[in-house]
Curated annotation (Swiss-Prot):
Gene: Slc20a1
Listed name of the protein: Sodium-dependent phosphate transporter 1
Record PTM Phosphoserine, positions in chain: 269, 273
GO-annotated biological processes: biomineral tissue development; cell population proliferation; phosphate ion transmembrane transport; phosphate ion transport; sodium ion transport
Primary role: Sodium-phosphate symporter which preferentially transports the monovalent form of phosphate with a stoichiometry of two sodium ions per phosphate ion. May play a role in extracellular matrix and cartilage calcification as well as in vascular calcification. Essential for cell proliferation but this function is independent of its phosphate transporter activity.
Lineage of producing organism: Eukaryota, Metazoa, Chordata, Craniata, Vertebrata
Entry GO CC: plasma membrane
Length: 681
């Protein structure tokens, strides 16, 4: 029997010896590609908010538009900029020469690193925690290396540099964003007429954005476009030339068109929101001063009470109507700050006006009419269009801090919804099924009601960035029922913090400024998406590149360039994650941290994207999450210290520190299984 099997055994041995040795681990390569795609998916789901979160938060683009633009620029950025950072991830963290005799161990380590990073990022995305993809892959790489080779396989000096960059990147990006926003606010926003200065600055902003973007592409030396053959002076010359050409195009063609559009929009200025009824002239003001008996014959949404004292000029106003709950629980006079309790009429109307620091007139009225149910009342806030009350109300809905608006009423806040539209759905009176009942009560009991009367008969006109995303989601539900019950906090802030609310109104964009900056924010968001694709695709593809090149060459120190198709593979995975789960973290980055306006969003996007692109070009794998969070917090703090949700920022900061050990532990566990069970000793 043995003599019969001997020829067969010798033949199989000869075939095995003649077969390429790389096919021995084909299963590991296939598994690596699958896990790498899942990792890219998780990167897109978690880090996409870094690119378009602020643009969606300010209402410049809708979520669908953001996904389309991000898909394009993420993919292009991953192909053009991702190769150099992938080299840092692949070779910069560990000493690959330690694996010369054990290539299989390095391949298993790459699979383990991708698995550990993917698992934690998926969990974090599900929990809506904005973590750093760079943190994940760095921690996972260190985890498998400790198991495979111990401390000798890790370049601790490179790790220290990377850890330092985690702290430097948010600080540097925050400083740059703060300086840029300070200049924009000083020379544009706070001017009596911001349009002339804004139009003058427009060519400069566009030139800087285009010039920086082109320089980053060419300086990286994208082989696909032949830029690796350009000398440094040629790169600078082409970038500056394109920037100047772009500035001339904007100055001679875009600026005149923008000026005409702004004049046309400001002159016509239709209603911006279903909750806002515009008052354009003195006649409208006078008509609102009517007898108490006439109140029931008018639409509550259109009621406006003029400020006491002489009227300086006809100001453009909006009326916001809210039904706030029981009169017994929240007395009328306790719902307004002390400086607003100027006059109380017999008919139950409280009149008041506040002069903002920038001259805007904010008026308030609280009326109890026969039309209102005895269990509640309406509160009308008539505000200048340029004030921040509308954004304040949006902000209060998602801040969800008990007592911020209703004093010590003890009401529970509105629960944050998975969709970024939950805030606007609540504001517009659209169906929202994510509520929180009071403690000890059944869900739905004693809910406050936010009502928009006659909502089904009103037509909404998409006007500017303040309400563009609100209008977009409302169009889908034009025939739906508009009355709803929302457990929400509404108002002007608690009695002790009214001055802080007025401080936040100071830097709200005027409508013409919104029109001026919304195009810039779209451009800078695309720039940020491009930079994000170049930097963060390495987090998903870096280990896969190492796995693939070792499999192909059987040389751990190979000098072959990163294949472009591998970078595109990662870009596709990032885009899929963006479309499926991207909105979850957009809610945190674009809305929860601080209210975003087009001008502040532009400053955040441009400065943080510049920081990321510079870091990508020098091969330093910094965190785009850190850069964007640093910019958002910096600009929010510069606008108003109370505009930043410091509790949320604290939670994000804590999540940054747990990411490295968690991903490292998962990767180390998988590597231990590979080393001691799966791979032969």
């Amino acid at each position: 029997m043995a003599s019969t099997l001997a020829p067969i055994t010798s033949t199989l041995a000869a075939v095995t010896a003649s077969a390429p040795p790389k096919y021995d681990n084909l299963w590991m390569l296939i598994l690596g590609f699958i896990i790498a795609f899942v990792l890219a998916f998780s990167v897109g789901a978690n880090d996409v908010a870094n690119s378009f979160g602020t643009a969606v938060g300010s209402g410049v683009v809708t979520l669908k538009q953001a996904c389309i633009l991000a898909s394009i620029f993420e993919t292009v950025g991953s192909a053009l900029l991702g190769a150099k950072v992938s080299e840092t991830i692949r070779k910069g963290l560990i000493d690959v020469e330690k694996y010369n005799a054990t290539q299989d161990l390095l391949m298993a380590g790459s699979v383990s690193a991708m698995f550990g990073s993917a698992v934690w990022q998926l969990v974090a995305s599900f929990l809506k925690l904005p973590i750093s993809g760079t943190h994940c892959i760095v921690g996972a790489t260190i985890g498998f290396s400790l198991v495979a080779k111990g401390q000798e396989g890790i370049k601790w000096s490179e790790l220290i540099k990377i850890v330092m960059s985690w702290f430097v990147s948010p600080l540097l990006s925050g400083i740059m964003s703060g300086i840029l926003f300070f200049l924009v606010r000083a020379f544009i926003l706070r001017k009596a007429d911001p349009v002339p200065n804004g139009l003058r600055a427009l060519p400069i902003f566009y030139a800087c954005t285009i010039g920086i973007n082109l320089f980053s592409i060419m300086y990286t030396g994208a082989p696909l476009l032949g830029f690796d053959k350009l000398p440094l002076w040629g790169t600078i010359l082409i970038s500056v030339g394109c920037a100047v050409f772009c500035a001339l195009i904007v100055w001679f063609f875009v600026c005149p068109r923008m000026k005409r559009k702004i004049e046309r929009e400001v002159k016509s200025s239709p209603s911006e929101s279903p909750l806002m009824e515009k008052k354009n002239n003195l006649k409208d003001h006078e008509e609102t001063k009517m007898a108490p008996g006439d109140v029931e014959n008018r639409n509550p949404v259109s009621e406006v009470v003029c400020a006491t004292g002489p009227l300086r000029a006809v100001v453009e106003e909006r009326t916001v109507s809210f039904k706030l709950g029981d009169l017994e629980e929240a007395p009328e006079r306790e719902r307004l700050p002390m400086d607003l309790k100027e006059e109380t009429n017999i008919d139950g109307t409280i009149n008041g006006a506040v002069q903002l620091p920038n001259g805007n007139l904010v008026q308030f009225s609280q009326t109890v009419s026969n039309q209102i149910n005895s269990s509640g009342h309406y509160q009308y806030h008539t505000v200048h269009k340029d004030s921040g009350l509308y954004k304040e109300l949006l902000h209060k809905l998602h801040l969800a801090k008990v007592g911020d608006c209703m004093g010590d009423s003890g009401d529970k806040p509105l629960r944050r919804n998975n969709s970024y539209t939950s805030y606007t759905m609540a504001i517009c009176g659209m169906p929202l099924d994510s509520f929180r009942a009071k403690e000890g009560e059944q869900k739905g009991d004693e809910m406050e009601t936010l009502t928009w009367p006659n909502a089904d008969t009103k037509k909404r006109i998409r006007m500017d960035s303040y309400t563009s995303y609100c209008n977009a989601v409302s169009d889908l539900h034009s025939e739906s029922e508009m009355d709803m019950s929302v457990k929400a906090e509404m108002g002007l802030g608690d009695r002790k913090g009214s001055s802080g609310s007025l401080e936040e109104w100071y830097d709200q964009d005027k409508p013409e400024v919104s029109l001026l900056f919304q195009f810039l924010q779209i451009l800078t968001a695309c720039f940020g998406s491009f930079a994000h694709g170049g930097n963060d695709v390495s987090n998903a593809i870096g280990p896969l590149v190492a796995l693939y090149l070792v499999y192909e060459t059987r040389d751990v120190t190979t000098k072959e360039a990163t294949p472009i198709w591998l970078l595109l593979y990662g870009g596709v995975g990032i885009c899929m994650g963006l479309w499926v789960w991207g909105r979850r973290v957009i809610q945190t980055m674009g809305k929860d941290l601080t209210p975003i306006t087009p001008s502040s969003g532009f400053s955040i996007e441009l400065a943080s994207a510049f920081t990321v692109v510079v870091a990508s070009n020098i091969g330093l794998p910094i965190s785009t999450t850190h850069c964007k969070v640093g910019s958002v917090v910096s600009v929010g703090w510069l606008r108003s210290k109370k505009a930043v949700d410091w509790r949320l920022f604290r939670n994000i900061f804590m999540a940054w520190f747990v990411t490295v050990p968690i991903s490292g532990v998962i990767s180390a566990a998988i590597m231990a299984v590979f080393k001691h069970i799966i791979l032969p000793v």
